[in-house]
Amino acid sequence: EISCSLVGSEMCIRDRVSAGAQLILAECAARGCNFHDLADYAAIQINDTHPSMVIPELIRLLGQRGIEFEEAVEIVTKTCAYTNHTILAEALEKWPRAYLDAVVPQLMPIIEKLDALARTRTEDESLAIIDKDDRVHMAHMDIHFTHSTNGVAALHTEILKNSELHGFYELYPEKFNNKTNGITFRRWLLECDPLLTATLEKHIGSGFRKDAAELEKLLASVSYTHLTLP
């Protein structure tokens, strides 16, 4: 079971993380982009902590292209952003150092250097990437080495700032922001279907553009035959 888990994790990192990072750099090179300005050409969104290994992997790949560690960290920080969807444990992964040593031995030295760099910014042990029990905190790495940390609802973001990630918020207040999750009709209706938008405006006015509750006025036209295209 352990070996299968190791193989599965290694394949995940190779196929999803490393291949993705390599594709980004390959496309960047094909377009004549300067790797030193990667953030001007690419944006990597880390959704929860499952893709967190893209941070050390991208640093490793940039190092192979002759970029020094300190600059690679700066480039990756500008390129990557982190979204936290929930404070539940499955979204705040922690992996034993020994496990990562077995799965990604080439990345552990980079993670250790990132941990050392993070410790120069704060003496708070609870914000370290590698804790006293030799566990690697993926969310901690994400917050330290991305330029943005967002929650997905106003209340959720306030909980992150004032409770669950309060120490990080005190250290990096400028990084924290909210991006409400979900689908907005303003995109799939107003932007994507102007003909339907015009039809609705003909029958119920334009108030629904700012107030979705105005769409309830359509209930007066449920016969379908009453609605006509503009």
Would you name each region that the model predicts?
Residues 9-227:
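A conserved ligand/cofactor-binding region detector
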